[in-house]
């Protein structure tokens, strides 16, 4: 369930320059469960006569617009959900959130349910009418249609993506049982059209309309990590679940955009899945491998397996749009190997948003917290606590932002707009085989500034969108969770800007200018850790937020609350 919350625009932060955007919270998740302790059956409510209110729905994950209605699907307790193979340890409980894992009531009632999914709850579906400013929950349209439809929704690990095209709204997400679950609505009447499971795929994140055709990017294999496909939607309101494969890629697709008559996609690496089974990076110290202390060798690198930018054939050549014969004709135009000097850390790079702006393609990286650390520990097990701490420190990365023109051509030019000229790299042969970290060149000089727009906790360049002639980049800021909600006191005489809690939204006002901060505090809620999705309506952005703080439900005015938020960013 959700509450409709209509608030005035957030106060503009004190600044000499008033930003050209205004921000308004349109709707907010409401408490949907009562919590009385880890491993305790959930009391009735809310309202909660026993225990405290809990808000499970944490992300606006898939977001689309059909006419004057926004459609979106949510994700519940996303911070607590772990991929297949992940090692779950003890439950987590603090003032902000709880992850019960195998001690949750659903897991205890079903011992066969994996602990990694103990905090799973079914996603919800909503529409928001832009004319009447009315929020309507549509979840029951699915669950009341048939037991099969209800079962598909109940086994969907969040409605991670959404699209609206030719009178059909599609919401899709990975199934906890395998495959991708897709739900369809009539975009004009709102009528529920049905659901299906696409068993050949395991993950789906984004869709794009290019040349009048709707495409989706998917992953294949465990957690989507074995390969990637681009699907062309060939359906309609009568048969909404027909697709054809138009790209066959070595890694799963993250995001898609049209640029100069082609599709470009960003991908995640295979290592993100492999690394999920690595030992815990905070507790692993190994003895020296082998009698002579010979370091372990990293796997041979295949750049096709790294996070990359791939380019399609021209959309206008041959039969309009992309077709099955185009599936093997995509070109890799960039990979993480062109920037990250450490060969193990680069295997954990993922890519996020990308967009066409000013005749150039922009894209950014994503860094799952401690993913590179876990991967590095699995390849080069540390031999002391000091070496473990060095690995933790030197494998952390904030996102970088790049842009390129004439990609794949003889006059190709790629610039690092925000990033580093050097990054730590591990030399396993140093210190007689013990290994050591040292600065290594990335081969670039950033045009405008450091990684994460200068914030080391800005880990994801999660989504990009062009609205009103500006390129917007939404981030995921991990500071609140990493610092456990306690901002450290900067040392005396410090010249660096302290981190802020809450996601950021930045804008490039023109291709020749540095990015400008629109907001760096989660749009007034420091618990909003990420700008998960954005869609464009003219010069207006509609933004879906990620906020996993499921125990932050104090209704006192001015107290930040957990759960998803739907936000409008518009020109003044």
Predicted regions and their residues:
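Surface-exposed loop and turn segments in beta-propeller and other repeat-based domains
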Residues: 22-52, 126, 132-154, 196-198, ...
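Beta-strand-rich domains and repeat architectures in extracellular enzymes and scaffolds
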Residues: 41-82, 463
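Repeated scaffold domains used in trafficking and secretory/extracellular systems
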Residues: 59-61, 145-163, 199-211, 248-257, ...
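Short coil/turn segments that connect the beta-strands within blades of beta-propeller domains
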Residues: 68, 166-168, 211-212, 260-261, ...
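Residue-level signature of beta-propeller blades and closely related beta-rich strand-turn architectures
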Residues: 76-78, 168, 175-176, 219-222, ...
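Beta-propeller blade signature
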Residues: 86-133, 180-189, 226-237, 278-321, ...
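Blade-level signature of beta-propeller repeat domains, shared across WD40, Kelch, NHL, RCC1
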Residues: 465, 472, 530-572
């Amino acid at each position: 369930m959700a509450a409709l919350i209509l608030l005035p625009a957030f106060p503009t932060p004190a600044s000499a320059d008033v930003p050209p955007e205004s921000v308004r919270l349109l709707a907010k998740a409401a408490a949907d469960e009562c919590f009385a302790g880890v491993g305790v059956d959930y009391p009735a409510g809310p309202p909660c006569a026993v225990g405290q209110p809990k808000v499970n729905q944490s992300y606006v994950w898939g977001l689309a617009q059909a006419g004057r209605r926004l459609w979106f699907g949510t994700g519940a307790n996303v911070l607590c959900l772990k991929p297949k193979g992940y090692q779950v340890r003890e439950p987590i409980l603090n003032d902000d959130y709880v992850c019960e894992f195998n001690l949750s009531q659903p897991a205890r009632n079903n011992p066969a349910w994996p602990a990694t999914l103990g905090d799973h709850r079914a996603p919800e579906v909503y529409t928001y009418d832009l004319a009447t400013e009315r929020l309507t929950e549509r979840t029951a349209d699915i669950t009341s249609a048939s037991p099969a439809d209800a079962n598909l929704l109940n086994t969907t690990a969040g409605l991670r993506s959404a699209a609206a095209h030719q009178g059909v709204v599609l919401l899709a997400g990975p199934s906890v049982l395998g495959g991708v679950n897709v739900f369809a609505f009539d975009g004009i009447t709102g009528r529920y059209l049905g659901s299906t499971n696409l068993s050949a795929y395991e993950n789906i994140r984004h869709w794009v309309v290019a040349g009048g055709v709707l495409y989706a990017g998917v992953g294949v294999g465990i957690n989507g990590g074995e390969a990637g496909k681009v699907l062309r939607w060939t359906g309609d309101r009568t048969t909404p679940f027909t697709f054809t494969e138009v790209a066959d890629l070595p890694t799963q697709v993250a995001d898609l955009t049209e640029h100069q008559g082609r599709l470009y996609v960003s991908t995640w690496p295979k290592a993100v899945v492999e690394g999920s089974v690595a030992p815990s990076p905070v507790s692993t110290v190994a003895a020296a491998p082998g009698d002579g202390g010979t370091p372990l060798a990293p796997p041979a690198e295949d750049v096709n397996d790294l996070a990359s930018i791939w380019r399609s054939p021209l959309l206008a050549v041959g039969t309009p749009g992309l077709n099955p014969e185009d599936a093997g004709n995509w070109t890799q135009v960039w990979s993480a190997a062109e920037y990250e000097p450490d060969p193990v850390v680069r295997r954990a790079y993922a890519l996020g948003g990308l967009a066409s702006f000013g005749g150039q393609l922009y894209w950014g990286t994503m860094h799952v917290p401690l993913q590179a650390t876990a991967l590095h520990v699995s390849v080069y097990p540390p031999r002391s606590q000091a070496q473990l701490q060095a690995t933790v420190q030197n494998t952390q990365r904030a996102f970088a932002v790049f842009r390129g023109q004439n990609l794949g051509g003889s006059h190709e030019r790629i610039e690092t707009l925000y990033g580093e000229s050097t990054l730590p790299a591990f030399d396993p042969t140093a210190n007689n085989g013990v290994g050591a970290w040292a600065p290594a060149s990335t081969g670039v000089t950033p045009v405008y500034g450091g990684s994460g727009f200068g914030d080391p906790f800005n880990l994801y360049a999660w989504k990009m969108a062009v609205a009103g002639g500006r390129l917007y980049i939404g981030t995921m800021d991990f500071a609140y969770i990493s610092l456990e909600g306690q901002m450290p006191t900067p040392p005396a005489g410090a010249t660096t800007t302290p981190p802020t809690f809450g996601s950021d939204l930045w804008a490039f006002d023109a291709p020749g200018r540095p990015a400008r901060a629109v907001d760096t505090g989660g749009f007034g809620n420091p618990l909003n850790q990420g700008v998960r999705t954005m869609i464009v309506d003219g010069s207006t952005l509609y933004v879906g937020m990620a906020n996993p703080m499921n125990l932050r439900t104090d209704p006192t005015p001015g107290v930040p609350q957990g759960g998803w938020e739907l936000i409008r960013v518009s020109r003044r």
